[in-house]
Structure formats: C-alpha cells, structure tokens
C-alpha cells in the first residue's frame, strides 16, 4: 500500500513538473509499465550496447576476416621507441619516492604535502628541481596541480 502511494506520488510530481515547463524526457528515454500499475524509466545508450551482453574494455574492434588485429602485424609495445630519455632527468632516492598511502580525504597533514616538503628539502634550489621532479614522478594531473601550488606557496612564504 505504501509503495503504491509512493508511485502515485511520483506520478503527481512528474505531472506537476511537466505542467511547470520543467525538463521533459528526451527521445532516447522511455517509461515502461510494471505489473501492478507502476513504471520505470529506461534509458537507451546506443554507444554502450553489446550484442553478446558483455562489454570488452581495452581491446580494439576487429572485424572477422580483417588483418587489422591479426597477431604479429604490430610490433610489441616494448620494442617501440620511447621518444624520451630512458633515465629520469631528476632521479629520486628511495626515501623520496611518491607516497602510495594517501587516504584522499583532504587531511591537513597529507602525505603528499609531506612529500612536497621533502622534495624542497632535498633539492634546495628554490623549488625548480622539486617542480621538475614532481612533473616527472607524479602521474595524476590533479595531484600535480595541488603539489605545484604547495611548492610555490612554500617557496614564496619562505618555509
């Protein structure tokens, strides 16, 4: 009984929203009836359909009979030229490796802030090599931006 009232209340809200000129369902959306008078909204995403019911991520689409993805036609990734120096420009000692234990909750004593401080103490050049090492050894662009700001603030304020 309570569920029926919730469903009916949902219809009243939807009808009121349509009457007020609010956002209407777009064409790929459709409402299907459930047994007992309820309904649910079903969205169709043409790019996400998989004919066999499974999605395959990280693989290229290859047509049957095509030579595009045949084994042996592409060189292995390890044999491709790297396009850059094989050794890092600013190698870090083991105690200065980027942290792996961040909880991502925005702590005031974040391990990444401590990492930026250790880089500044190690290089002691006003932050230039610390910023370069940061660019080279930290993969996440958001963390890089945060740490860049921390290093720049630390060098401006003098510690």
UniProtKB/Swiss-Prot annotation:
Bias type Basic and acidic residues, positions: 52-63
Cellular component annotations (GO), alphabetically ordered: mitochondrion
One Pfam short name: Oxidored-like
Domain of life: Eukaryota
Disordered: region residues: 36-91
Boundaries of every Oxidoreductase-like domain copy: 91-120
Protein name as annotated: Oxidoreductase-like domain-containing protein 1
Gene designation per UniProt: OXLD1
């Amino acid at each position: 009984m309570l569920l029926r009232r919730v469903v009916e209340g949902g219809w009243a809200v939807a009808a009121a929203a349509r009457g007020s000129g609010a956002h209407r369902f777009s064409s790929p959306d459709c409402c299907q009836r459930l047994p007992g008078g309820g309904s649910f909204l079903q969205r169709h995403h043409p790019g996400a359909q998989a004919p066999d019911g499974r999605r395959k991520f990280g693989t290229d689409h290859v047509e049957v009979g095509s030579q595009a993805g045949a084994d042996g036609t592409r060189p292995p990734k390890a044999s491709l030229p790297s396009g850059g120096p094989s050794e890092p420009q600013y190698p870090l000692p083991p105690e200065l490796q980027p942290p792996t234990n961040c909880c991502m909750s925005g702590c005031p004593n974040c391990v990444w802030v401590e990492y930026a401080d250790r880089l500044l103490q190690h290089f002691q050049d006003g932050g230039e090599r610390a910023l370069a090492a940061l660019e080279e050894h930290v993969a996440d662009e958001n963390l890089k931006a945060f740490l860049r700001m921390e290093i720049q603030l630390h060098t401006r304020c003098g510690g």
